[in-house]
Amino acid sequence: MVSIRLPDGSVRQYEHPVTVAEVAASIGPGLAKAALGGKLDGELVDTSALIDRDASLAIVTDKDADGLDIIRHSTAHLLAYAVKELHPDAQVTIGPVIDNGFYYDFSYHRPFTPEDLEAIEKRMQELAKRDEPVTRRVVSRDEAVSYFRSIGEKYKAEIIESIPASDEIKLYSHGSFTDLCRGPHVPSTGKLKVFKLMKVAGAYWRGDSKNEQLQRIYGTAWTRKEDQDAYLHMLEEAEKRDHRKLGKQLDLFHIQEEAPGMVFWHPKGWTLWQQVEQYMRRRLDAAGYLEIKTPMIMDRSLWEASGHWQNYRENMFTTESEKRDYAIKPMNCPGHVQVFKHGLRSYRDLPLRYAEFGSCHRNEASGALHGLMRVRGFVQDDAHIFCTEDQINSEAIAFNKLAMSVYEDFGFDRIDIKLSLRPEQRMGSDETWDHAEEGLRNALKACGLEWEELPGEGAFYGPKIEYHIKDALGRSWQCGTLQLDMMLPERLGAEYVAEDNSRRRPVMLHRAIVGSMERFLGILIEHHAGAMPVWLAPAHAVVLNIAESQAEYARTVAQSLQKQGLRVSADLRNEKISYKIREHTLEKVPYLLVVGDKEREAQTVAVRARGGVDLGVMPVEAFVERLREDIQAFK
């Protein structure tokens, strides 16, 4: 007798072992038809999986997130099936699920063209309509290697050869195509109805640039056409908002081959940067942080003591001088500990909050670089709080409030918070971890925030809170972090004198709100589609004269506004006013001030707001008042 407990708490009993599909059918024909897989004691399995013991089971359908993953995984295999039918000499490698879709890497003697993708997608649709059953068989490693070598799939054979000989290998087949996979997969190809191939890109075999370059075909798959249409529309909007495109259009920054992953900031872009940095500096100062500056290059010995040299060296830029090894800092924390250690610290000094707009460099792979979002040289709004265990809760509460307020000011009102808890391998006692985790939980609770807990995802030296902001397109970006660290103060010898005159290690809280300034500015540009809130905009307004006779008045107006601390310039070029208006509209300047003879005589300006809104003619002082109200509204 086999007892199956269902999600609603009910228990069904079967005289013999049953498959997931049979359990679904016993519940109802609708569920049997909708079943894509099962969750057996928490593990995803195929509908063909045999249950021969008492267990809990949830039937997975296309209404479940797991169901969508199964569909995407199966569609990746459908892609490989179609490619092999159309291009038999193509070699298949790997094809995982990724955010919003999947990809599959192929080795082929020529590049796939857009026409190839169109033909492959058409063949995928034909294969799906055949509704061929997807079957699974388990074989030994040697049997699997032999099979794939016999059909000329050397990459698959190489993957399997790296698997321990004692492991069982799962092979999935539909029609004439067989692939290596851990599964699960849909029961038949007819379940795959909504998908689209997106693009082809290069990828190295096993991610190593020394290996052969493969062709990676990306695709997306969904349960409903409406969802796919919405996703494709979002991609269109994302392309319009691409910070690389807007960075060029708005003359904010550029990146060039001589400095890969490093940003050249132009005057307008640097003005935008400064608005963000100065805003953050004001907020940190008000919250009791002390700003410091630490060296960019430090001796190898410090990085060995911190553990970075042993564990992070491949991502560090290093140099040598006078027979000493140095590293350009990839992070600021070891330097902040040095400042803390300089002098005797008392418990009365704690909490001590050090902040730095620290310039860091990391040797990211060239293929991973992406505009401002993934760079090699970046600045963080980094800070480290040195405190006692009893102060963790109050410091976390203060940080949560500060972070939420900052995100709101920048226009982000949807924040997902994740709390990563202790892993199996960790330092510190269970009591210390209990205290630390509960301190972070209570801090989130005290701020009225909701969060998701991730057991086992914390670092071995402490739990962590992550702050994921959602932009105007619903995309999630991890920016803020509050990481509790019980290790680095010990490794680097940080201590303070406790109330009983004993020497104790402080707890170290690593924290950032915007994270990488470069990345955050990229997010801001895309979130606002380049039309920055007035307080952030590189230019508040531009004064435009209609004819040469108003040039002096236009210049005077601009200078008057500049003296009042406003970011205003005058465009006095001998161009048609319509041309100048169009140009500055494309630059997304919040206000255009047009002056003709009437405005000069009346000492007024004709005001056009961003979006082509005509605000009419008004005295310069009235415009200044309006502009200041706009700036304060966003602050």
Curated annotation (Swiss-Prot):
Catalytic activity: tRNA(Thr) + L-threonine + ATP = L-threonyl-tRNA(Thr) + AMP + diphosphate + H(+)
Residues annotated as binding Zn(2+): 333, 384, 510
Identification of the protein by name: Threonine--tRNA ligase
Cellular localisation: Cytoplasm
Example of a GO MF term: metal ion binding
Entry-linked InterPro entries: aa-tRNA-synt_IIb (IPR002314), aa-tRNA-synth_II (IPR006195), aa-tRNA-synth_II/BPL/LPL (IPR045864), Anticodon-bd (IPR004154), Anticodon-bd_dom_sf (IPR036621), Beta-grasp_dom_sf (IPR012675), TGS (IPR004095), TGS-like (IPR012676)
Cystine connections: none
Entry's family note: Belongs to the class-II aminoacyl-tRNA synthetase family.
SUPFAM superfamilies noted in UniProt: Class II aaRS ABD-related, Class II aaRS and biotin synthetases, TGS-like, ThrRS/AlaRS common domain
Main enzyme class: ligase
Region (Catalytic): 242-533
Comment on bound cofactor: Binds 1 zinc ion per subunit.
Every TGS domain range: 1-61
Keywords in alphabetical order: Aminoacyl-tRNA synthetase, ATP-binding, Cytoplasm, Ligase, Metal-binding, Nucleotide-binding, Protein biosynthesis, RNA-binding, tRNA-binding, Zinc
Main location: cytoplasm
Cofactor: Zn(2+)
Annotated organism of origin: Burkholderia mallei (strain ATCC 23344)
